[in-house]
Amino acid sequence: MTNLDNNWFPNQVFEDISVWQRFSQGRSHDNYKKILLEVEKYFTSNEPTFDSISEFLKKRSDFFDLFLKVIWNKTLKSKRISLVAVGGYGRGALHPQSDLDLLILAEEIEIQSHGELIEEFLTQLWDANLIIGHSVRSIEQCISFAKADITINTNLLEHRLIAGNKKIYNDFCSELAKNLHGDTSEFFHKKLEEQENRYKRHGNTCLLYTSDAADEV
């Protein structure tokens, strides 16, 4: 999962290293915004020397993995719930200003039992001014919704476990392979149909249609 190199993190990122230490040890809830501001300041400065754009994007993704994991462990660590990165974030390459696409995965009874804790986790992310796209679903709901909506299906093509229950995530991977992503030809035809429908909505002309780069990648 997270692979942050101590050669640059956190010693080179934070002017006051104690800010990160208090956060990572669960001793502070009031400096989330400060941490994110300092990290973004670092990434947009001339200080970091990454070998490639790919490394830059991976380091950003790695940092947010760690940030989310710290907050998750404060609220939902011992629960039978998984925090999964999906979509572009699931690829492990996070562009500046990109949403963090998150799937909170659990059995329905766990979602109902721990709804307040899940809400607390999400509230902390919003309070930190994180831009997130999230869903809270069971494995069965993921499969059902993805079969009915090719956009959701596409979003589940790339995914990673960030924190939480490994068994739930492994079961999720097995069900995706068995029920959703096993037939590549069917998926291709659905994507083609989606593209054609989107084209029609824009008057059947390229002069009125600007493709969504995120959809086309």
Give the location of each predicted region.
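N-terminal regions immediately upstream of nucleotidyltransferase
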Residues: 1-79, 97
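Glycine- and acidic
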Residues: 46-56, 102-107, 204-208
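Active-site nucleotide-donor binding segment shared across nucleotidyl transfer reactions
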Residues: 55, 65-115
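Generic recognition of stable, solvent-exposed alpha-helical segments in well-folded globular domains
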Residues: 59-66, 116, 120, 151, ...
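Conserved catalytic core of two-metal-ion nucleotidyltransferases
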Residues: 69, 115-163
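C-terminal or mid-to-C-terminal helical accessory/interaction module adjacent to the motor/catalytic core
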Residues: 154-208
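Conserved small/polar residues in nucleotide/adenosyl-binding loops
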Residues: 209-214
